[in-house]
């Protein structure tokens, strides 16, 4: 819902709708379990799952004997309401042995033993195969359960899991999302010591990890390691390093990699272009934004309203109202519907250069094309007109101007 420009100056009080999210009880069960809230020390020391990935670490005989003493009791008695509800939501398509482990995890209690003891007991009783491990991991990941990483690291050491390089890479990605650099590096080191090939996929995951964590030098060093593999780099490896350069505040280096990709006929993803364009745009680097915008089209990617909006914003921030207006009109000529955000950016560009007459002409053109002003564009006008102290005068002028334009010559 919007308003035409003549009424824009009187409407600035719209409120955003309240969005209420829903949460499944099955998911909440894991989050509310106090056993899942661990300190940094507990995470490193309380369970041997993490420690087992360290170099030279072996499972001692006394640990194995403790595992045998785990009290594997059938679940069903003395359940809380939440536990009972969570159990009923276990996917029926899971195998019986997987359902059994899920029930034990839901009702896990330290009085029965450690969590790794539980996994060891399940391993001996159920003789799981790789498909069972993967089924458990998938469900725990869907639940966003902290038990996921414990099961994942424990499974890597089990013959029945038949671990491969991608299993290690998934754990690196997991730690990357949490910015846990040391844990990811430990996983990579364990992977090397177990004889797995460190390939481009794994190193790209490390580049992403270092980039997100702000370790830009390590990201660049790892990217150079990928080049030393002697294999053609794919768009993911390039894209990860470009994102690292953007986060490091050197988009020029990222743009240089884009040109390198272009010379090898490798197309970056839309999100990479968008991130680079956004960086130039927010910094008011109109020339850089225009170069990236042109590169998007050369790559065969059709610009959408968000990409066009970033280009308009670059001109707006740098005070180039004429170019902002031109980019806006080109967007419309391309058949892209203008958003209120884009209209607001053009108005902001006019405000920065104090071009009131041009702004009024722009508003009249919008009204002629039946384009209504929304909350954001109206707010820009309100701020500008109040600063000038001409709210009522401008409203009257707009109406008179609009009326004169509609009369036949």
Swiss-Prot record:
Q: Which residues form the signal peptide?
A: none
Q: Which Gene3D superfamilies match?
A: Tetratricopeptide repeat domain
Q: Which PROSITE patterns match?
A: PPR
> Which Pfam families does the protein's record reference?
PPR, PPR_3
Q: Which cysteines are joined by disulfide bonds?
A: none
**UniProt xrefs under InterPro entries:** Pentatricopeptide_rpt (IPR002885), TPR-like_helical_dom_sf (IPR011990)
List UniProt keywords, sorted A-Z: Repeat
- Where would I find the PPR repeats? 164-198, 199-233, 234-268, 269-303, 304-338, 339-373
Q: Which family does it belong to?
A: Belongs to the PPR family. P subfamily.
Q: Which PANTHER family match?
A: OS07G0661900 PROTEIN
What is the protein's given name?
Answer: Pentatricopeptide repeat-containing protein At1g01970
